């Protein structure tokens, strides 16, 4: 229901109330001159009553809108981590080729562009630091134990000799892209994994594996590796927002991380043996596709300033617009509002923290145009009429129309500023 329909319904409700009032008043005061129904009233009086009903509906609509706006702005400033939209997330897998001879380190927050077949571009950021190693899973063997349990031999190969061990090694547990089966396998690793050992070299004869020079490894860590998020890692998400991302796409918890020792000479491959105390889960088949190296979780976010606004006292509410309208960006989370003055960029305080002039409030996702939501910046600056100020909004943006234009496969490339 749009605003016009809401206003018209409120007007009909007011006219119904006026009609009931006129009927009750006519019953109590029969000689007042008012008719028992509005349709029988004098045209001038009828128009006056309709005007009263219309303006009453407008006042009621404006008051309701202002109360809702004030309540939402208050919640937005106190609990922004609960009201911010959840961006799209995903996992990109690096496919190694003969051209990759050395590991490639990708920092956390590295920007990528995903271009679909219809030439739409979407901006993504990596969620954690990762390293692409020139390796791939050649084979996986499931070997039953002597009495109980079993062993899983994962044979890694590379197209060129490795001068250094692929440390740290992050592996994604992905069972035919099924979340439930993948988490079932992750639970099996966490509950039944007893030990992990490493053999540096190509696995030729598995039957002779007991004679190999094995190196014992620490048990793997899972998920985000237990590393706390710090400000210098360019992280702007609240811990609750991170938990909301998990419930939207829990695959980031399907990673296991291994610490490998240094190698003394070049190697052409290596084998990792996982020893379990329980048999392999029923209904799951061990194949080389269940453990995937070189995977990076990423998120559809981009940090950039909004269009600058000029607070000159004529208006107090300004739309927060992206500098790239054609890209379909919507405001995900404001990071700060700054005023340009002689000292440079001065941050403004939020209205819920301080009423010191100037301060600001954010009205998020209140205007919808052509299927997109826009937010407003409200400035409390009484001196702006005599002393105009130029303001900038630093924010995180996302592209919610990604799901409408997602076509697989797509081209992914690093974004060069």
Predicted regions and their residues:
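Activation corresponds to long, low-complexity, non-globular regions
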Residues: 2, 99-132, 319-360
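Short, surface-exposed loop and linker segments with low hydrophobicity and enrichment for Pro/Ser/Thr
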Residues: 81-83, 143-148, 254-270, 370-402
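Short, low-complexity Pro/Thr/Gly
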Residues: 159-170, 174-357
């Amino acid at each position: 229901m749009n605003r016009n329909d809401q206003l018209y319904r409120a007007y009909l409700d007011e006219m119904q109330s006026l009609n009931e009032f006129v009927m009750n008043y006519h019953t109590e005061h029969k000689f007042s001159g008012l008719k028992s129904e509005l349709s029988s009233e004098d045209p001038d009086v009828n128009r006056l009553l309709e005007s009263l009903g219309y303006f009453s509906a407008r006042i009621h609509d404006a008051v309701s809108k202002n109360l809702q706006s004030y309540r939402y702005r208050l919640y937005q400033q106190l609990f922004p981590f609960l009201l911010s939209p959840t961006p799209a997330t995903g996992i990109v897998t690096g496919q190694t080729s003969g051209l990759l001879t050395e590991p490639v380190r990708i920092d956390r927050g590295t920007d990528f562009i995903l271009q679909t077949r219809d030439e739409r571009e979407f901006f993504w950021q990596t969620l954690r630091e990762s390293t692409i190693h020139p390796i791939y899973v050649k084979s996986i063997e499931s070997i039953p134990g002597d009495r109980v349990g079993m062993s899983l031999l994962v044979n890694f190969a590379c197209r060129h000799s490795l001068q250094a061990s692929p440390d740290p090694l992050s592996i994604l547990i992905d069972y035919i892209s099924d979340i439930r089966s993948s988490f079932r396998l992750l639970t099996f690793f966490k509950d039944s994994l007893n030990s992990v050992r490493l053999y540096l070299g190509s696995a030729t004869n598995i039957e002779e594996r007991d004679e190999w020079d094995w190196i014992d490894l620490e048990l793997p860590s899972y998920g985000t590796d237990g590393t706390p998020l710090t400000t210098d890692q360019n992280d702007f998400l609240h811990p609750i927002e991170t938990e909301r991302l998990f419930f939207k796409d829990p695959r980031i918890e399907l990673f296991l991380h291994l610490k490998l020792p240094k190698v003394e000479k070049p190697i052409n491959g290596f084998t990792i043996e996982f020893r379990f105390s329980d048999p392999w889960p029923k209904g799951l088949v061990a194949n080389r596709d269940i453990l995937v190296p070189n995977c990076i979780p990423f998120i559809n976010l981009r940090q950039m300033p909004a269009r600058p606004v000029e607070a000159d006292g004529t208006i107090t509410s300004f739309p927060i617009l992206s500098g790239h309208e054609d890209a379909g960006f919507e405001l995900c989370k404001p990071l700060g509002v700054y005023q340009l003055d002689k000292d440079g960029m001065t941050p403004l305080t939020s209205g819920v923290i301080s009423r010191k002039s100037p301060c600001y409030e954010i009205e998020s996702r209140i205007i919808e145009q052509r299927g997109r939501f826009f937010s407003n910046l409200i400035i409390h600056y009484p001196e702006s009429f005599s002393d105009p100020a130029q303001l900038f909004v630093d924010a995180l943006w996302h592209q919610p129309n990604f799901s409408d234009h997602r076509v697989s496969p797509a081209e992914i490339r690093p974004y060069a500023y």
